Amino acid sequence: MSVKVEKKTDSYLKDTIQKLLERSRESGSVFWRDIAIRLSSSRKNYATVNLGKLQRIASDDDIIVIPGYLLSSGVFNKKIKVSAFKISEKALKKLNDAGSEFVNLVDLASENPKGTNIKIIR
């Protein structure tokens, strides 16, 4: 399956996909390639996750990747590390108030090149 980056018009998205593919090739991990493939698909297929869903699914100290958008609906009070393509301002504020951490996808790929102990939420 090829990754069609050239069809994307958003430069931030193109850059993110290319950097995730580079990390995947460098580390030999298919995890970051899978995230890049999900981001290279149509936007209607992106994951849209609310904080309320993370509250139900995640445990404290989990590392969560969302190949799409993180929105602020719901109550949230867990201490986790979250990474997503985009996050709303309210969701970021709720995460910080709960003591959680938001990390860019590319930065998380640099921290954890193999993608071990990371959950993908859709």
Curated annotation (Swiss-Prot):
Name the coiled-coil region(s). none
**Under the GO molecular function aspect, what terms does this record hold?**
RNA binding; structural constituent of ribosome
Q: Record's superkingdom? A: Archaea
User: What is one cellular component GO term in this UniProt entry?
Assistant: cytosolic large ribosomal subunit
Q: Which UniProt keywords apply?
A: Ribonucleoprotein, Ribosomal protein
The protein's matches in InterPro entries, at most eight in alphabetical order, are given as: Ribosomal_eL18 (IPR000039), Ribosomal_eL18/eL18-A/B/_CS (IPR021132), Ribosomal_eL18_arc (IPR022947), Ribosomal_uL15/eL18 (IPR021131), Ribosomal_uL15/eL18_sf (IPR036227)
Gene3D superfamilies xrefs: 3.100.10.10
Per the UniProt entry, the signal peptide is: none
Q: Which GO terms describe its biological process?
A: translation
One Pfam family here? Ribosomal_L18
Family assignment from sequence similarity = Belongs to the eukaryotic ribosomal protein eL18 family.
Protein name per UniProt: Large ribosomal subunit protein eL18
| Encoding gene per record | rpl18e
